[in-house]
Each structure stands twice: as structure tokens, then as C-alpha cells.
Curated annotation (Swiss-Prot):
Keywords from the named record: Autophagy, Isopeptide bond, Membrane, Protein transport, Transport, Ubl conjugation
PTM: Conjugated to ATG12; which is essential for autophagy.
Domain of life: Eukaryota
Subunit structure as annotated in this protein's UniProt entry: Conjugated with ATG12.
GO cellular component, one term: mitochondria-associated endoplasmic reticulum membrane contact site
Cross-link named Glycyl lysine isopeptide (Lys-Gly) (interchain with G-Cter in ATG12), sites: 147
Name the record gives this protein: Autophagy protein 5
Membrane-topology annotation of the record: Peripheral membrane protein
Length: 292
């Protein structure tokens, strides 16, 4: 078991984990694709960076400021409501594991009247100059996700609904500017003390599969024993475990292979690795393209 100082250091590293992204402008009217290089936080959201990206690209096409944009990876629209690190692990990690691509991530920025609303949440708000307000849409979605996780953890959404206007604003600003100290000060008002959790909000993704396991997890069994990460995987992904109790794939959280902690209490894994919406996102790569 790590000391409190070690846990603080790990959480700080997870909070500040980053990804190098290369964004190409998807405009058929431009012969040579323009690119924008940026380092983004894993525990953040793409719309936070859209204003900077748009400011750079609008010198090539002014329309981009007034049309909602989306990102694509290998022609597939990216769901911006998920944390960037989760998207990276879900869509790109398998290519790295197979040594087919390097760790940087190349995406294409698209904009048109034909927004892929069947795959991506649309941006519906605008500013007074008719430019797209990405911040307002993102805030609405993230706060809703925090309400969902709060309900799972507490059995109701009262802790987040009862936040003062000042605390609500500070919580959002801490996410927007990526301030861990401010975030923790408000988030602790949402999460019950002394680990008195009703359930734990957990989502499990399998790259290449449309299946999403959205599993509110009881941290303790009926007999009072702590539920392990292994127990969760065996229950929801029985094909992951072999007959001799070995894993047939790799388990990633925040881009880290966590097989060494598979026998840890799920409540401790959640507490350490939860994302800023208080969900624990687990990515499972089956052995067809995973290495341990």
C-alpha cells in the first residue's frame, strides 16, 4: 500500500499526463493540408482546445469560426464528450501496442453544415458575434456526467445539486484551466467521506467493439468483503480470464497497463484512477493485439 505522499504524487502525475496531437485541417479547397501541433492533457476534453485550434486555422478559412467543428480519426468522428485520454486509448492505443504507429496522434479537423449529429453531440450555443461557444456546450455535458456519477456514488445527486453557485463555478473553472487543487477542494464535497459509497461509477471499453459496459459497481460483497478489480473483469468480461486464471488481454487505465494491480480493491483503484467526471474508465485490449 502506498503512503499518502506517494498517492498524492501518483494522482498529480495522472492529472498532468499529456498527449502530443497533430491536427490536420480537413478542407478540400486547400491543396497542402495545414497542421497544428498541440500537447493536450489526457484528463481533459478536446473542446477546451478548440478555440486555440480554430484561431490558428481560421487564417486559411474564416468560415471555421462560425461553423461547429469536429475531429476525426481515420475518417471516424470522435466523441468529444469523453476524456481525451480515454479516446486515445480506445482508438489509438492498439496501434501503438502493435508498433504500427508512434505515440503521437494525428487527427483531422472537419467543419461543414453536415455535422455528424448521429455520432457526435452537436454544439448548439453561439456567442454574440455568432461564433460557436464550445465552452458552454462542454460545461453542460460534463456537469451532467458529474451528476450521473454523483448519483451512482451517493444514491442521489443532492451533493452536486446543493453546491453553491460559487462552488459550481469554481468546479467548472478548475476543469477548464486544469487546476487539480481547486478541483479537489470542490469535488470532495461530492464524494462521501470515509468511503461510504453506494456504488462506484465504472465504464469498460473494448477497442473495435461497439459494446460499452456501464457498470455501477458495489465496492463490497454481501459478506462484506472488498470487491477486487479482478472480480469486476471476471463478472463482465469472463472471456478475459483463462482456465488457469491468467488474463488473455491487457487492461489499461489512463494509458497504463494495470495488470499488476488486478487483485487490488476496486474502491482503491477507483479512488486513485477516476477521471475528473468521477468515472473510472477501463480499456481492455484482447490478446489479438495486446502485449503484456
Amino acid at each position: 500500500m502506498q503512503s499518502s505522499n506517494e498517492l498524492i504524487e501518483i494522482k498529480d502525475k495522472l492529472w498532468n499526463g499529456s498527449i502530443n496531437v497533430r491536427i490536420l485541417m480537413g478542407d478540400d479547397n486547400i491543396k497542402d493540408p495545414k497542421e497544428f501541433l498541440i500537447t493536450v492533457y489526457r484528463n481533459s476534453y478536446f473542446p477546451i482546445y478548440f478555440p486555440s485550434v480554430i484561431t490558428y486555422f481560421q487564417k486559411y478559412n474564416e468560415k471555421i469560426k462560425y461553423m461547429p467543428v469536429w475531429l476525426e480519426y481515420e475518417t471516424v468522428p470522435i466523441k468529444w464528450n469523453l476524456p481525451i485520454g480515454v479516446l486515445y486509448d480506445l482508438l489509438h492505443l492498439s496501434s501503438i501496442v502493435q508498433n504500427r504507429e508512434d505515440s503521437s496522434w494525428t487527427l483531422t479537423l472537419r467543419f461543414s453544415d453536415d455535422y455528424p449529429t448521429d455520432q457526435v453531440i452537436p454544439f448548439t450555443y453561439t456567442d454574440v458575434d455568432n461564433s460557436v461557444n464550445y465552452n458552454k456546450s462542454l460545461k453542460e455535458v460534463v456537469v451532467n456526467q458529474l451528476k450521473q456519477s454523483c448519483f451512482v456514488i451517493n444514491g442521489n445527486s443532492k451533493p452536486i445539486m446543493n453546491l453553491s453557485e460559487k462552488d459550481s463555478d469554481e468546479l467548472w473553472n478548475s476543469i477548464r484551466i486544469h487546476n487539480l487543487k481547486s478541483f479537489n477542494q470542490i469535488n470532495k464535497k461530492i464524494i462521501p467521506i470515509q468511503k461510504k459509497f453506494q456504488k462506484l461509477p465504472v465504464k469498460i471499453y473494448i477497442p473495435g467493439s461497439a459494446t460499452i459496459i456501464h457498470a455501477p459497481i458495489y465496492p463490497y460483497s454481501d459478506s462484506g468483503e472488498a470487491v477486487l478489480l479482478r472480480d469486476i473483469l471476471e463478472e463482465y468480461l469472463p472471456d478475459l480470464m483463462s482456465s488457469n486464471n491468467e488474463t488473455l488481454g491487457s487492461i489499461y487505465i489512463h494509458g497504463i497497463n494495470v495488470e499488476t494491480i488486478i487483485n487490488k480493491d476496486i474502491i482503491d483503484v477507483w479512488e486513485l484512477f477516476k477521471h475528473l467526471d468521477n468515472f473510472l474508465y477501463i480499456i481492455v485490449l484482447f490478446s489479438t493485439y495486446s502485449t503484456i
